[in-house]
């Protein structure tokens, strides 16, 4: 493509392409008047109207026919006029031609743009409109594409890169010598000596001067010239290839050289262009003629593919033989396939406007070089992008509205009605024996009366009126008129955030950079207004004193002072002036050019060293193509200035220097003879002993590296920091001018390296010195900068460079154009753009009194310490070499900037370190760099700065992990939650040798970056946004936000504008994170985070909640966690960070009175793992930077909770990477697993919870859960029926065969079927409960967990593993062999507070209190519902159902008989809180609700089976194990077991009194919590058991038996419902304790439906357990004594006791919508209100998904018309808020006013148009039906209406009513009721048919009344005789006139008023 710069040459080819593609113009032929008239007449409705007029004329209705014809003709003429006018307007708008300079036939000439064909090369000029789709071959341009895309921001286009040239000169230098030398190098450098003669022939060939055809992009861009050959020439083949070059015989067989590796940069020319429109690939033919631009083109012909031969002269035979195969191979490599997104960078679309030209290259044509930019034509005419858009607009598929289709159907109904009337008329006439020809005309007349031809057009009248009203009143244009009716049915509105809900104008308010002291942390927010000089001065002074590599180099001053030519008399400086000396030197380093010019004479009079002959040259460096200016290094007579200073300083500054410091102080902080300005006489750093420094150095040594009396290792004994000589200074009393030139050589070194130049561009700003050398220091100068950017440029130079360069702005007509955000960022830097032909330079604007320090390239051979910075008055400038444009898909952009700083100034000085070892390393690196750069000049030794700007999430992925600050996510969350818009900037530095700018890939540029800082912008909300959102919501329209911004920023804006209600309790955020699975394959995992709403919490709790991401646990109880004060005293208080950090105790005291687990927490070991450092909390190095997402950051508090996590330790030993560590954080309680999402929703009002999704989560949900549906109500009943009657396997097959997409949890459906039939069932609650169970199953099947996670919760065996701190390694090795077993749980009671804590060796740490509970989960499924979900036939399932039945039966029927409590209704809880204060409870209702909740919910209670023997007595003594280990400090209370070490239990319990019974067994291997005396329970329940046994004996033969046996054959046992007594009030606890023991071990169960439902045939999957069931035999359930039933203590019990908060009059009943089938994806789609980080394609997918919802929702999209084009086109209506009318191409409506009121106006007018259309339709249809019935009645009495009557009815009455009905103004507010959108709907049909019946009823009544009147006489014979008389009709008028005028007009007006 690049090689087509010579243009087309074949005239035949040009003509063929003109015929094939047509002319390059969108020329539309307009139709003539006759054709348009014919189209109007051929309309079927107009034909029907002409037919009706013919019928009326035959029926003698001449006047009426003429009037209708006149009205119709006027309407047709007006329509034709508008059509012709629109056609001319469109033609003039699309027809565009301009003169074009095209290159054809080896010359350039001007032609019309309409004559261009694909393959032409033409010149692109400034301010021109591109006539066709063009590829840029050279240079770059800035385009305005607002016409096509709606993008108002200018777009920068670059030339198409040539991928074939992969090699460039490493020095980026390209010689401009003869082309002959370039081509000679190709062969001579790598060819053998034998080829010299042959190369001589090539030299002769290339020596010709006809080189004008060689011009191409390869020659245009100086960087693209041919380079060396990679591989050597094969001499063997050359020797074997014996060719006679003097032979003229062309038919001689030629040998081919196969191993000739020619240069990769070979270019291929082609003239034949083919464009494949399907894949967008540019394919060229005749690529074999690739070398014709290198040789004599006159002697080269085209390659003939048919014969595979080339016609060439004998002279070139050798060359073409050598290159034939290589050219073909290279041509295939150079065919690059570009995607649509990639080709957009290089393509200029037809119809776009050229704003400016850049990088114009020199092109040689006709021996003349001209600066031009060339483009290649690839598409013309209607094939172009603009042509396709025009095609779609002009010839689009007319989408017929449903209303139009419904009107046609309704016309069929009217035709049927007319035919029915015709049959009636025929029957009447035939019955009267009237056989005349007039009957046919009467029948046709009735048909014309019944069928109004204008009925379909009435539906479009309201549309046209609404569009005209929107255009005139509100400046809203409409592209698709039919969308106005759809706008009236919108019930969902999607908003973009930026530019739509918020203002377009952003404010740049500050930056956040890395902390200079600690690079791993970000500093606080630096507001722009807070950047004052005061803080700058302190940091500057500290750097000058403490930093030996400071820019204001003391060595530089000292060396210059030594080299001054001073006088023989040297005045000494006393000690009193020694400190003042340093201050004065600093103050005298002025850069005020104004002072220098104004006081030139005074300075010259006091100047020495005249014989040095120093010229007024510059002391500057050439920085990034910046111009050089003069700067002086001025030195003053110190003593003279001191004396003058004492005399002339005013009172306020007499004893102060710089406004703050005393006379003899150095830097305002030192005493008279102090060193370093801050410390006492012999102390340094103020913290160490008298003569010691940092506690590391000897007595008289400083910094450990210098001699005894030396300071900083480089100064003499009496020198101070290289600036002062303590006793003497060799200067005289006058000012010395020191002019430094780079080219001037002095005795001292003049070039030094500046290691810290990146950190600070120090600019000493000082005020004028008067002629008397007095200082004038205004105090306001120290308060603020003249320009705020000075602070950033001085202290953050890299950030300043990024702000100035990292953008896509352009300059057009001296005006900066581009994105608003980038304009703000660029204007802050006070820079300007200088755009030349081949450069894009950013240069700082000139300032009057401000000069910069700039760095120069020093002598590399000098060490880093011998550095030097020159004072220069040049302004900073940067050269942008390459830009990668911003892409919404990538969410970033990047630039490559050329800099002239030394290579040793790698910003990795920011790495830190002032250590000498690091400096030595830098010096070594510099030396290595010098070796590499020996061939280069110092002035050309550049490096490239790469800056990347984008979203914080993307930049974090691209940066090196070591360069990301630790508090990156914390700072990001902090400011995004405040609604700030944040951009991240990163950089990396690349040497010029290591990068090829022409072929560098974006992936290389945007990788391994270093984080630089955050840019903070504010985006204010539009003032009317909350009102508009509220108005839409109250009108029944759901509002959704879809934005590409950060999640927290989107939530903040959504709260502020009202999309998220302020009363919402919590916001649940869904996101997708990468998870490493098996074989180290990354998978995506959906996670949920809980984000609490601050406004709700503040309003209800009246407390200030920190707006951070909080977990469900939020904060631990500040008083007690484990019964003692772990958090009550200070965890981070006195003793952790105080004295005893690693001491004996955390809080200075023992927790629980003794050491936890017998050892110190921070002592030797905790569970065998060392936690002496923060990184070793988990036993291995753990870095918080490796958290998978920003929400996974964990605080130290949370990490402490998991230090005993056995699972984590085992996992962490496998892999220490963050990939496995992430599993720890995935189970944090703020990380809500997907299966737990509905656990939150099920207990809350759905209106109080909002869901927020990211773009990744949205796509994930769509792919994974789109096909899973909830069952219908009737399907639930059928499945329950199958479950009760059939077996499990059959049911599973039936369900799978029934519908594979339906997923049922058959175990729970029966419970829900019961609840569905309740009278006041809340649909929302039911939906969440069903959803909860379905999500459990789906997640389990989609994500297969690891075996150890599943086995942990399975009821398998009990292995009580102890932990001995002395044998940790042995225990760990044993644990690896064994599966995860159930551990002994310790229960410890806190008597001071009613709390109970379960400290398990594994994962469960539960904290229960009166008001809340905290459950820390470390696994996916911590509760026992996992068993219910995984194994339906498990023991736990059967046991739970058994207990459910037993508890319900016996507690209700037996226990209540002994209850004396009064029956009181359960009170409602006023507020959903965790305080459960209950009054007296109705026991029956309480137990019933408890048992009912237990049947279906996630509730898990503790069940223990204990012995039922008289010998079983639980004493208040201690309980020990058979094999036990206890600590000396172990404490055991009377009602519980408490041991600091773990207990080994072998299923045997011993009493302290050695009372042992083999039958006594505790099946659950945990302690039992009993309150009160157990004897009372046994006596109380003994009577119940006796009664029950009597009943069993009676019914023993006819009942099924339920048997529960243990492995040890214990005969008796009880099930105790163990509920915590400390979680309730006293009355509740006492009530519960009375009914502890529920039932005996063995019972006979009745054969009832409840039992049949739950106890059916099952097969156990567990080892050692079996299930069996049959009708004859008893059902036996064998319980293994090792089964662990309990995992969670009172998990959801309290929540399920709450009364539903939903008001029954608000929530929907399930019976109203019971047949809705809802998928999981649709369920979340309905409840989600905010979508963040959405890409443009994601937005369109969201809108399409919302449109597919089953309730026929209509979705609207509102955007700014730039990034939302795809979403706007996919929506039912698209509303673009843009200033440009042309952007309406991608949206249905365009508002010129950037105001959200346009949305309300469009919806109002849409609803008004819909209502008006329906009203007019009903009015016209009823009018025609009534008129038909009226005429039929008159015909039955042999009468009819006259002409005047028809004219009066149709024209005078009906026509004005229909016109004024449509012009009725719309309402000013949106109503709550959305109008009906279908004609065939029940209300409209009832209205029409009801009116027909009513009018017929009144007509019949009126006729009966008329016939019964006395004056009415009807003689049939007389009428028949008078028919022939003309006076017949007039005689009948006195009857018909009354009827027609009074009755019919009354009916018409009545209908109109009724409809109004």
Swiss-Prot record:
Please name the catalytic residues of this protein.
496
Please list the reactions this protein catalyses: ATP + H2O = ADP + phosphate + H(+)
Instruction: Give the GO molecular function terms.
Output: ATP binding; ATP hydrolysis activity; ATPase-coupled monoatomic cation transmembrane transporter activity; metal ion binding; P-type transmembrane transporter activity
- Which residue intervals are annotated with compositional bias (Acidic residues) in the record? 907-935
Topology, Cytoplasmic side? 1-35, 81-407, 463-1818, 1864-1881, 1953-1956
Question: Region annotation Disordered: residue ranges?
Answer: 901-938
Q: Where in the cell is it found?
A: Membrane
Which SUPFAM superfamilies does the entry link to? Answer: Calcium ATPase, transduction domain A, Calcium ATPase, transmembrane domain M, HAD-like, Metal cation-transporting ATPase, ATP-binding domain N
**What main location does UniProt list?**
membrane
Q: What is its EC number?
A: 7.2.2.-
Topology with regard to the membrane?
Multi-pass membrane protein
For this UniProt entry, which segments traverse the membrane?
36-58, 62-80, 408-427, 441-462, 1819-1837, 1846-1863, 1882-1905, 1929-1952
Q: Look up keyword Hydrolase and say if it applies.
A: no
Q: Which Pfam families match?
A: E1-E2_ATPase
Q: Which family does it belong to?
A: Belongs to the cation transport ATPase (P-type) (TC 3.A.3) family. Type V subfamily.
Q: What is this protein called?
A: Probable cation-transporting ATPase 1
